[in-house]
Amino acid sequence: MPGTAEVQVRPGVEEDLKPLTDLYNHYVRETPITFDTEPFTPEERRPWLLSHPEDGPYRLRVATDAESQEILGYATSSPYRAKPAYATSVETTVYVAPGAGGRGIGSLLYASLFDALAAEDLHRAYAGIAQPNEASARLHARFGFRHVGTYREVGRKFGRYWDVAWYERPL
């Protein structure tokens, strides 16, 4: 697995659909990090991909191995809520491929994402982190997020309830 010097971060494109779906499905099947409980097909994920264009407030940034072009992770900004008054708020997520953790991929992705969002008319970014997840909490703290509350036992997956800690960051 490459170090961060051999990683490129770029906007997500249509050709990324299958590997991004495979990466996400790992988290669906194996972890409580996402509260989706059934894996997706690439076609089911296509609307998600298309909802993150190259510009605007809702972005998809993809980290790839510079040589092999293997996807190492991705970060998104998505609508926080559907109602119009929330339009200047986004929810951010970051997913790192199994085996690529601990190499700074998440930091590269978030740096790229927040650089891309700097020119947008946005006020706040929010991130929900299923607990426990110390690595994600540290990543978010490094990028200026602060813990604002925890929803207790808000989701049920794998036969148990999970808390979600919420973090916010000014943009």
Curated annotation (Swiss-Prot):
It comes from the Bacteria. Acetyl-CoA binds at V94, Y95, V96, G102, R103, G104, I105, G106, S107, N133. The keyword Thylakoid does not apply. Keywords: Acyltransferase, Antibiotic resistance, Herbicide resistance, Transferase. It catalyses: phosphinothricin + acetyl-CoA = N-acetylphosphinothricin + CoA + H(+). InterPro entries: Acyl_CoA_acyltransferase, GNAT_dom. GO terms for biological process: response to antibiotic; response to herbicide. Belongs to the acetyltransferase family. PAT/BAR subfamily. This is Phosphinothricin N-acetyltransferase. It comes from Streptomyces coelicolor (strain ATCC BAA-471 / A3(2) / M145). The lineage of its organism: Bacteria, Bacillati, Actinomycetota, Actinomycetes, Kitasatosporales. The gene is bar.
